[in-house]
Amino acid sequence: IGSLSLYRRCVKKILPGEGSLRRLRIEISNTIDVSEGALAPRALLVGVGGTARAALKLARHYYKMSDDCRSMTAEQLDGLCAFLCGGKKEASDLILRLEAERIHTLIPGMLILQHVFRLFKAQQLVVSKYGVREGYLCQRILKNNTDTPKTGS
């Protein structure tokens, strides 16, 4: 499930209204269809990707957290989601100020994140500084460096 495809299927305007939020939540539940108790609880989740980093950036600002903070709690995520989904101008202003390029996908992505939190009964999200692409690239570079023959001096 991706936040952009979810946005395209469920949201009619730039930011989701009540009807769109309902459609988003139903679509997320239907797509990530896991029966209650099927997953072992995990207190800690690790977020790798742009949505997780953007959510953390907004949480830092909204909750006045330090710039070097790399995590947020379930309560903070729920509070931030409630604020962003509340339909107030301050919410869209915050997104536009901090993550304008994610204006369409941030709320759908955060609702996915919130759903995953609930499935695992997670208490905290730690957000990686780097995404999957960076990790793959580093792995390829490091692997190539170890395969390179060394010249003697």
Residue ranges and their predicted role:
Residues 1-153:
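Helical "lid/coupling" subdomains associated with nucleotide-phosphate turnover
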